[in-house]
Amino acid sequence: LKLVLISTLAVFTSGAGLFSSKNNDIATDKSIKSTKPWANIEGFRSAKFGMRMDEVKKSITRDFAIAGGKIDAISHPTEQTQSLGISVDNLLPNSGKSRVVYVFGYKSKRLMQVNILTGQPVDMDIKPQQVVDAGNLLGNHFFKKRYQEDGLVAHARLSDGSVLIFRGKDQKGRMALLRLSNPQPNAKKGDDLKITLTLSYI
């Protein structure tokens, strides 16, 4: 995908013009590379990469006080992977409902990826600016750590118009990826834009 660097975090150039960040303390690419300490991407909260499904269920209960009956078991029809899914309210301040999916390896049966979705269609009532604010908050969190220069991306627009807020790998090659979906390209002021923030730990 062709990447075109953009100067501000999570800015959509749609007709609505709603999505400019108010945060003036955005880190630059140079500061991301030199900032210490190194990032350590181990999983999500107490659920760590390499855990078995039963261990992740215990982590979910510990992290979110969600009982086993409210944890969804998901099977991918083509990749044949198994996942656990939960819904969480206000995972970030004023961010509405989020969907957290823990993905396990087909052969290893161990946790290998965590995907977190905020915004549409997880929460049909959330305001677009709430989703953008959540992206800004997460982006600035990632920018405080140091990552490998290889593959490091910040503030980039993808060819489909979506915004890659951040992509970076720790010293072990584990990745965090934060992406804000493209709103409707022909949206006008006042339109009900449907955008999604996706955070993946891989």
PLM regions and their residue ranges:
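Bacterial N-terminal signal peptides
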Residues: 4-12
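Non-cytosolic coordination micro-motifs
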Residues: 17-72, 113-202
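Short N-terminal edge-element motif at the start of the domain
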Residues: 59-95
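Short, cysteine-centered beta-strand-loop-beta hairpins and adjacent loop/turn segments enriched
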Residues: 92-96, 122-125
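Glycine-centered tight beta-turn/hairpin loop motif at sheet-sheet or coil-to-beta transitions
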Residues: 94-97, 171-173
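Hydrophobic/aromatic beta-strand elements that line small-molecule binding cavities or substrate pockets
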Residues: 100-105
